[in-house]
Amino acid sequence: MKEGIDMRESVAEEPKHKFFQSTEGENKSLDEVNGSVKVPKNAGFWRTLFAYTGPGILIAVGYMDPGNWITSIAGGAQFKYSLLSVILISSLIAMLLQSMAARLGIVTGKDLAQLTRERTSKTMGIILWLITESAIMATDVAEIIGSGIAIKLLFNIPLVVGILITTADVLILLLLMKLGFRKIEAIVATLVAVILLVFTYEVFLAGPQLDQMFAGYMPTKDIVTNKSMLYLALGIVGATVMPHDLYLGSSISQTRAVDRHDRQDVAKAIKFTTIDSNLQLTIAFIVNSLLLILGAALFFGTNSTVGRFVDLFNSLNNSHIVGAIASPMLSMLFAVALLSSGQSSTITGTLSGQIIMEGFIHLRMPLWAQRLLTRLLSVTPVLIFAIYYHGNEAKIENLLTLSQVFLSVALPFAIVPLVKFTSSKELMGEFVNKAWVKYSAWVATVVLVSLNIYLILQTVGVIG
């Protein structure tokens, strides 16, 4: 055993002087943390669940990033509680697909990018890497805009300076990686808790109509017949699955030490990883519901503009719009939650970038360099817009709409292979998708891909 450890250490130390390293021939996804979290043997349910708790929160972050906020709040402001049913259905689809991604990683010992690359050419691997990297950068743009505006609102500094400050998260990430994977999970969980508590408090103050709120979780035909409502519903469903979250989920499910030759150990890992994923995605569902409920309780019927972060911030401090609960503290709490959302997504974006680079093009670079490169590529267009429009937040937020197009383009290249691989008896053995799971997943795939194509065409103006 000691000999194996020494060999691993010598391999880890060998490429220190190499900036780019080839990962061809390596099988482990995120090798530095793969199997690094020990799971107690023969422990009780709660102790075992605690050991598996963590990866799910990193996945859930993608479902409550700043890019989703405006759609949810605007949905409530325009159509009250009617679109809560769309959030519910979207969350159930997310739970299904993320559980499949985790199961794929646990059973095969490889992530989605690695398995896709094994079945495609080198050229196609590069193309898929570029498409998925573009999606990660698009998510990064949303984080930068959200974090930059939050910093400006909290500290009253120029937006350009706030955007530049967001690049400092490279240093934060380096520190977190040294602390260990469990510490990363705990810090992200803390940031998510801040978001959850802020919006729970603000919804409590807003005093929503509970009977109408719960009725909103039942779908109505208006969602399909009302064109404006349909467009917002498409926006919510279209953002259901972040493509890079599927790659991430298939990889970080392998951070727990599992004996893949032991059927019971694999089955246990699948069970508890799925529970963790569903619990954390339930939190994301609650946060997105709270955002829509807040929009409905405070802004429905007021004719207020709530399509921008700054509009929302100012409205929460305006008694003519939100009534007696308006206060500077309410606005500041919103900005704190916005900053927490942007920063919590930083870690998952970096890990996803490493996974797809190693999986698709068999290349590894230092995390700090990868994060810096991704962030600089994302910051550049935002900075150009910020300087050109003299720090006008409303103009800059238009980039959010454009960034969603990249996410929509990348989605089919992640979701179709995922369903195909997890439905393969050859790959998954006895853990292959059950019939109802397979058919449900294919229906969800067709719906999501179709909606994303529709959104792309609508965004670029091909259809009205």
UniProtKB/Swiss-Prot annotation:
GO molecular function, one term: symporter activity
Alphabetically ordered keywords of this record: Cell membrane, Ion transport, Membrane, Symport, Transmembrane, Transmembrane helix, Transport
Lineage: superkingdom: Bacteria
Induction notes from the record: In response to bitter compounds derived from hops.
Keyword Cell cycle among UniProt keywords: no
GO biological process terms on file: iron ion transmembrane transport
Pfam families linked: Nramp
UniProt xrefs under InterPro entries: NRAMP_fam
GO terms for cellular component: plasma membrane
Transmembrane segments: 57-77, 82-102, 125-145, 157-177, 186-206, 229-249, 281-301, 321-341, 376-396, 399-419, 443-463
Membrane topology reported for the UniProt record: Multi-pass membrane protein
Task of the protein: H(+)-stimulated, divalent metal cation uptake system.
Family statement: Belongs to the NRAMP family.
HAMAP family for the chain: NRAMP
Protein name (record): Divalent metal cation transporter MntH
Species of provenance: Levilactobacillus brevis (Lactobacillus brevis)
